[in-house]
Curated annotation (Swiss-Prot):
Transmembrane segments: 5-25
Swiss-Prot/TrEMBL keywords: Chloroplast, Membrane, Plastid, Thylakoid, Transmembrane, Transmembrane helix
Principal place of residence: plastid
Designated name of the protein: Protein PsbN
Intracellular or extracellular location(s): Plastid, Chloroplast thylakoid membrane
Keyword ATP-binding: no
The keyword ATP-binding appears for this protein: no
Length: 43
């Protein structure tokens, strides 16, 4: 049972880490350098 708990905690922390990194990239300080393709092609 201890092995299953360890794997569950690892997978949960991995998912939380990837989500936190994606939010940081989207809204962090470097987000100003990201281009928006919808703004480039306004009709």
């Amino acid at each position: 049972m201890q092995n299953a708990t360890l794997i569950s905690v690892f997978v949960a922390s991995l998912v939380i880490g990837i989500t936190a990194y994606a939010i940081f990239v989207s809204f962090g300080p470097s987000a100003r350098n990201l281009r928006d393709p919808f703004e480039e092609h306004e009709d």
